[in-house]
Structures are given as C-alpha cells and as structure tokens.
Swiss-Prot record:
Similarity annotation: Belongs to the KdsB family.
Gene Ontology MF: a single term: 3-deoxy-manno-octulosonate cytidylyltransferase activity
Role this protein plays: Activates KDO (a required 8-carbon sugar) for incorporation into bacterial lipopolysaccharide in Gram-negative bacteria.
Keywords: Cytoplasm, Lipopolysaccharide biosynthesis, Nucleotidyltransferase, Transferase
Annotated organism of origin: Pseudomonas fluorescens (strain Pf0-1)
Gene that this polypeptide is encoded by: kdsB
Pathway: Nucleotide-sugar biosynthesis; CMP-3-deoxy-D-manno-octulosonate biosynthesis; CMP-3-deoxy-D-manno-octulosonate from 3-deoxy-D-manno-octulosonate and CTP: step 1/1; Bacterial outer membrane biogenesis; lipopolysaccharide biosynthesis
Pfam families: CTP_transf_3
UniProt-listed SUPFAM superfamilies: Nucleotide-diphospho-sugar transferases (SSF53448)
Gene Ontology cellular component terms for the protein in this record: cytosol
Official protein name in the record: 3-deoxy-manno-octulosonate cytidylyltransferase
C-alpha cells in the first residue's frame, strides 16, 4: 500500500464571473500561488499546477511551481487531471489529489486526510470528504451537493436534490431538520488512483452525470467505489464571486 501522493491543481484562466481568476491579486500574490503554497504545506511528494494558459504558466514559474501545460479542449477538470497523470508517468496505483485552483484557504490537513483515506481503503478508487448539514436552507439549496454513504463509508449517491427526502417529517414541517437523519454536504476535494483517471475519461459522461452536473456520478454509474469521510477540518469556501474574493482578501491581508 502506497501512502505517497501527488497534488494536481487544475487552473483555468477563463471564468464567467471572475475573468483571469487564478492571477487575481490577493495580499500581493496571485491566487494560484496561495493555493500552491497551501498544497505545498501538505505531505504531498509533488505539487503540480495544470493549466491550458501560457499566462498562468509564466506566473507559476515565477514563484517556483512545477507546472504542466495541457490541452485546451478538456470538458472537465478530471479530464485535465488524467492528461497530467499520463504526462507525469504516474504508476496506476499512484494517488493523485485534485485541489481546486480557486481555494486559497484550503487547509493542508484536508489534503492529507483525503489522500490517507484512499491509501487506507484499497477497495476504493476514489476518496472524498463531507461535513454535516446543520440547517434546512443548506439542505434545500441545489448549489449544495448532498451525499449518502453506506455503513462502510462508501458513497451510495450524490445529488443536488434534498437527499434523503424525509417524506413524513417534511410533510409536517420544512423549517427544521428531521431528527435522526445524518444529512451531509459533499466537499469537492478528491483523491484518485492514477490508473482510474484514464478509465474515467475513456467512459465519457452518462445521463445521470449530465442531469445533475456532477462528475462523480460517472464513477458510481460504472460501479466504482468512492470512500467518503467527514472532514477533520471543514475547508472554507472557494472564490467564485467578487464577494468571495474580497472576503479572502480581508482574511489574508489582516
């Protein structure tokens, strides 16, 4: 069983809400540098930025990061990850952790946790994290992905819908969470086995993945086991909007 792992940080220049997001300044550094620095504090043996944009390549080289230039036609971050794993020549059982390029506050311990979980669960080809849902607003928010696991910690399904739907309890009232139902929010950090990444992209999207816009459903569709654990530390939300950017700037410039 290998416990060593590589972090890959997919980073795209294009963004509908925040064009050039990876290079936006936060406390004197581009956002991608903050993400790379946090990932470098983890136990990863290697941290690599993956991008299709020459401007991001140059910025990463300037602060000393290893960077791989990828194709521009990838449909998803996982497709980009698979290309990088192949270019790096990673062994099929090597562990790769995907850290999003817009999470400058990600705790290094979270990266270590998801990698260690996959290493410890040889029956799984993916691992990810979750945290408890504590209010009905979050539960009914379609932008929050819910996850249900079996008694062994393996994912049964993910959905943007209310999952599971407590039929009887919600028939009476929807302003409080039903007792005894462990609602959980999926946290979008993944560890993969490198060989699995090549299988994943070869399958192509399935209708369920397309319906929910959730890539991990492609893995479940093909019978892949995904280990899910509660995060030891809940990571702060990433930077998706101008408001998020200002919030992170205030935290890092304080």
């Amino acid at each position: 069983m290998t416990t060593a792992f590589t972090v890959v940080i997919p980073s795209r220049y294009a963004s509908t809400r925040l064009p050039g997001k990876p290079l936006l300044d936060i406390a004197g550094k581009p956002m991608i540098q903050h993400v790379w620095e946090q990932a470098s504090k983890s136990s990863a043996s290697r941290v690599v930025v993956a991008t299709d944009d020459a401007r991001i390549v140059e910025a990463c080289k300037a602060f000393g990061a290893e960077v791989v230039l990828t194709r521009e036609d990838h449909n998803s971050g996982t497709d980009r990850l698979a290309e990088v794993a192949a270019k790096l020549g990673l062994e099929p059982d090597a562990i790769v952790v995907n850290v999003q390029g817009d999470e400058p506050l990600i705790p290094p311990s979270v990266i270590d946790q998801v990698a260690a979980n996959l290493a410890a669960h040889t029956e799984a080809r993916m691992a990810t994290l979750a945290e408890p849902i504590e209010d009905v607003e979050t539960l009914f928010n379609p932008n929050v992905v819910k996850v249900v696991s079996d008694l062994n910690g393996l994912a049964l399904t993910f959905s943007r819908a209310t999952l599971p739907l407590a039929r009887d309890a919600f028939a009476k009232r929807r302003d409080v969470l039903p007792e005894g139902v462990p609602y959980r929010r999926h946290i979008g950090i993944y560890a993969y086995r490198a060989g699995f990444l090549q299988d994943f992209v070869s399958w192509g999207p399935c209708w369920l993945e397309n319906t929910e816009s959730l890539e991990q459903l492609r893995a479940l569709w093909h019978g892949v086991r995904i280990h899910v654990a509660d995060a030891l530390i809940a990571p702060p939300t990433g930077v998706d909007t101008a408001e998020d950017l200002e919030r992170v700037r205030r935290l890092l410039e304080a």
